[in-house]
Amino acid sequence: MHRNFRKWIFYVFLCFGVLYVKLGALSSVVALGANIICNKIPGLAPRQRAICQSRPDAIIVIGEGAQMGIDECQHQFRFGRWNCSALGEKTVFGQELRVGSREAAFTYAITAAGVAHAVTAACSQGNLSNCGCDREKQGYYNQAEGWKWGGCSADVRYGIDFSRRFVDAREIKKNARRLMNLHNNEAGRKVLEDRMKLECKCHGVSGSCTTKTCWTTLPKFREVGHLLKEKYNAAVQVEVVRASRLRQPTFLRIKQLRSYQKPMETDLVYIEKSPNYCEEDAATGSVGTQGRLCNRTSPGADGCDTMCCGRGYNTHQYTKVWQCNCKFHWCCFVKCNTCSERTEVFTCK
């Protein structure tokens, strides 16, 4: 979801809020506003649209979480041929990759985790109705270890459940891609859950730690992104196992193994090999690398040889100018020199 679209949603809700103040009819106005907004959001499945209409306060948070996932995806792949861009259908989760590749696996995992993270944070901050701090982490005292639950523990289970209900609702086709997407959604949420942190505060006389009050907090989303990038690098190719009677996809097993071994719950899985992402290709969703910045001297993925797929690169020269060697003179002005530097950038042909 683009930032301008998110702002549009916010301003529409704001306008309906002003209308409510003037008319004094909250329920009907909110319902009308939710219907208008939810019908305008591209790519929503019927169940997602129903959730949007019943929980209009949550749709902005969902959008923030989806955008957080997209931003993290772009950060993790900023130096690769594929930079988290696609030519697929526009949805609240960005443009979808048409190929069931390891890149698609990452995008599903990171956006599912992003929605769970954003919803959990909004609940802890009191920005969503029907949720708050984790009630199960209140009042317990561990006398042996000298600590008790206190403060506001993030209710990550609520965030995960909400992400599961909303994000997974777009999987309506009964095929192998559905099983792949659902597995990767769950893997992203599981990585988030496993990285929850315990923070404690000491209580006692003169700085001693007679007792501790502890609570759980969300990890930084960058940490989740790094972990999922590692999962992407070790992604597992799978194939579908079909039921004997209806021949419908039943579960996924690791490909090239004789046994029916299922992937681990935190594995990212894919069913199709990745394209090379060198050229624009509507069939795969690849946008190609033409015009991408590259590093002429790097031997890595961001190097011009790799990034440009052997097509060569263009050199662009420009002069960078800035204020430098600034000194304060009494009294009272600052005098600076003007420095300049000739700079080159390289883009793929």
From Swiss-Prot:
Residue ranges of the region described as Disordered linker: 238-266
Coarse class of the protein's main subcellular location: secreted
Disulphide connectivity of cysteines: 73-84, 123-131, 133-152, 200-214, 202-209, 278-309, 294-304, 308-348, 324-339, 326-336, 331-332
Modifications after synthesis and translation: Palmitoleoylation is required for efficient binding to frizzled receptors. Depalmitoleoylation leads to Wnt signaling pathway inhibition.
GO CC terms, sorted: cell surface; endoplasmic reticulum lumen; extracellular region
Alphabetized UniProt keyword annotations: Developmental protein, Disulfide bond, Extracellular matrix, Glycoprotein, Lipoprotein, Secreted, Signal, Wnt signaling pathway
Record: glycosylation sites: 83, 127, 295
Subcellular locations according to the entry: Secreted, Extracellular space, Extracellular matrix; Secreted
Signal peptide: 1-24
One example GO MF annotation: frizzled binding
Lipidation (O-palmitoleoyl serine): 206
Family to which the UniProt record says this protein belongs: Belongs to the Wnt family.
Role this protein plays: Ligand for members of the frizzled family of seven transmembrane receptors that functions in the canonical Wnt/beta-catenin signaling pathway. Required for normal fusion of the chorion and the allantois during placenta development. Required for central nervous system (CNS) angiogenesis and blood-brain barrier regulation.
Domain text: The intrinsically disordered linker region is required for recognition by RECK in brain endothelial cells.
Protein name per its UniProtKB record: Protein Wnt-7b
Organism of origin: Mus musculus (Mouse)
Source taxonomy: Eukaryota, Metazoa, Chordata, Craniata, Vertebrata
Gene field: Wnt7b
